Amino acid sequence: MKIDANKEKALNAVLGQIEKQFGKGSIMKLGENRSMDVETISTGSLSLDIALGAGGLPMGRIVEIYGPESSGKTTLTLEVIAAAQREGKVCAFIDAEHALDPIYAKKLGVDIDNLLCSQPDTGEQALEICDALTRSGAVDVIVVDSVAALTPKAEIEGEIGDSHMGLAARMMSQAMRKLAGNLKQTNTMLIFINQIRMKIGVMFGNPETTTGGNALKFYASVRLDIRRTGAIKDRDEVIGNETRVKVVKNKIAAPFKQAEFQILYGQGINSTGELVDLGVAHKLVEKAGAWYSYKGDKIGQGRANAGKYLIENPAVAQEIDVALRALLLTPAAPVADSATGDENIDLETGEVF
């Protein structure tokens, strides 16, 4: 694009002035001096990484994971922490619910000796800790469990039954404004776990909403809706959950995709089972009757045995994983901003409907 000489001279002068005042890199052309690819961390589920479009959750962004009780929200975040730690990243867990089980976290592969953990007394304290960790530039992933447990100081110091209209929403709104810029500068991922509530008197549409006001919906680059869809049984014993995750909002790729996987009790996401299923679907793993084969070698009779073979042979599992990612992942392309995905907002009241 050719620019008029006088305009170009004026533009260069003002750019120089801005950089002198605010520092180099404070303003630049969009395609210049920056990485166009978003750095991501795996969620522990290959199908969810593919549904996200970029191979995982994005660094330097805010992520919200919400769903009903016991749907796998904390498990998913612990899988992300384990994946980040395997890459040598520093992680922190803000346990506002005071319910983190270190034994379970260790079973999922989390290095609990190097995981920073805080159990704050108030919501303001939790968010201040988040801000301090972010500004340090030394922490790569921060998880807050959960937004619903971030209780404002005024509510804690008041009496039960006192009205505190909009306190949590105002607190979250202020925190989002403060955190968003720092997260981008330090390339820190901030994951908020959230609970769902029912709106009273909704006749049509979805009565569900999340806690903490609307600010988080707008500032989050990715919003994941996680649900338990069924039970996994071994004879009569329930050993896990069938889980579905919907990408409700996605600023780094196309939204509204879904992923289905299994969460096994005491083990976490059944990643090897996913590799077997996706490998068969995309003809990387051959299936003849009950037998599964890879590159002509039999790897097991039945899905469970094939998965066990991949656990015992991580090099083969890694090979299939890399091949599937190369086949199914497309380069990340930013999409138009959307506040809440498939939800709508009443601009007068701020209600989600």
Swiss-Prot record:
The record's GO molecular-function terms, alphabetically, read: ATP binding; ATP hydrolysis activity; ATP-dependent DNA damage sensor activity; damaged DNA binding; single-stranded DNA binding
Q: Which InterPro entries match?
A: AAA+_ATPase, DNA_recomb/repair_RecA, DNA_recomb/repair_RecA_CS, P-loop_NTPase, RecA-like_C, RecA-like_N, RecA_ATP-bd, RecA_C_sf
Please name the Gene3D superfamilies in this protein's record: P-loop containing nucleotide triphosphate hydrolases (3.40.50.300)
> What's one GO-annotated cellular component?
cytosol
An example Pfam family from this entry, by short name, is RecA_C
Q: Give the residues the record marks as binding ATP.
A: G67, P68, E69, S70, S71, G72, K73, T74
List the PROSITE patterns hit by this protein, alphabetically. RECA_1 (PS00321), RECA_2 (PS50162), RECA_3 (PS50163)
Where in or outside the cell?
Cytoplasm
Which controlled-vocabulary keywords does the entry list?
ATP-binding, Cytoplasm, DNA damage, DNA recombination, DNA repair, DNA-binding, Nucleotide-binding, SOS response
What is one GO biological process annotated to this record? DNA repair
Q: Could you name the domain of life of the organism this protein comes from?
A: Bacteria
Residues forming coiled coils:
none
Q: Which family does it belong to?
A: Belongs to the RecA family.
Role summary: Can catalyze the hydrolysis of ATP in the presence of single-stranded DNA, the ATP-dependent uptake of single-stranded DNA by duplex DNA, and the ATP-dependent hybridization of homologous single-stranded DNAs. It interacts with LexA causing its activation and leading to its autocatalytic cleavage.
- Record HAMAP family: RecA
Q: What is this protein called?
A: Protein RecA
> Which organism does this sequence originate in?
Shewanella sediminis (strain HAW-EB3)
Q: Which gene encodes it?
A: recA
